[in-house]
Amino acid sequence: MDEIIFRQYRLGDESRIVDLFIIGAPHKRTTGFWEWINKCGPFGQSIVEVGELDGKIVATYAVMPVQVQFKKELVKAGFGIQLFIHNEHRNINNTILIADRVYKRCKKEGFNFIYGFPNDYAFPLHSKVMGWEHIADFRCMELYTQKIKSDSEYDRDIKIERVEIFNEEIDNLWQQTSIADPAKNAVIRNSSFLNWKFFNNPLEHYIANVAKINGEVVGYMVLKLFRKENVFCGHLVDFLSRKQNEKLIFQSLLHRAFDFFGWAKVDVIFAWCFPSNTYFEMIYSIGFRPTGFNTHFALKPIKNNDLADLTKYDNWFITMADSDAF
């Protein structure tokens, strides 16, 4: 049998990469989605390696560049996506070969680290073979709609509007949040990131609401509808609010979300929200519980820097928007 040739992605590989995903992955993927996530990201194009055999792509690994707030500074990092190898060639040796090629390029490009959410199959390889640090396992927060305790406490002077684009006004919000001060480790939420993630995605449909006080944008929340077998689900994909009046702003956004999910006849609502997250107490008080699906959160050091603050679970602000799965 001929050996797999590992090399950098070249223009024209897209269709054969998507062939590979469709053969072995449950999620719908298209060349449009591949180009959106790897070529159109707000922080630059992904580093992509492939393995080719007999004219077919049998392995691929992509790392998307992101800007992460770390100790009040913006650092260059990567989000690990789309590590996939054809079943007939899936082994530790091929995984290491393609991963090492990606990591060397990440180092050359000045990445400080890579983060990701490896699935149950990939996680042991990441943690035991590929040099990733396990930050935490966490469970999705979930709330069955018939168990909502109350969402009546909200300020009617806070106006909630649905938007079809995030304008530059949203860029001012980040520095006014409790995520920015005191600084959490977090991918920057600016208009470029939010519009790319929620309005340019060629596969997904999102509902974005902003909160306004006296005409000024003071918060936002992004929702998604999702059907899994016979269960109709709602996702709180992303949310952020100004520190001043934080609770009232968030509650107003939640009220609008519940109103929409009620109209849609959603059965259960999901969200990612760590206990250290400023919003955790608010969603816990109305019935959300960490009883949903489990997720592995891990990090791959690229530079020899101090990882102490990066590998502490409580130091991160993470929502579903930080994953490519939602």
Per-segment meaning from a language model:
Residues M1-G12, K147-E168:
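Conserved N-terminal entry element of GNAT/NAT acetyltransferase domains
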Residues I4-L83, D120-Y121, F166-R242:
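A conserved beta-strand-loop-helix scaffold within acyl/acetyltransferase catalytic domains
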Residues S15, D19-I22, D100, K104, ...:
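A broad, structural surface signal
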Residues P65, N112-R156, I207, I213, ...:
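Active-site/acyl-donor-binding loops of N-acyltransferases
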Residues Q82-I85, R90-K104, E246-D259:
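Conserved acetyl-CoA-binding loop-helix of GNAT-fold acetyltransferases
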Residues E88-R90, I98-Y121, L125-S127:
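Membrane-interface helix-loop-helix junctions at boundaries between adjacent transmembrane segments
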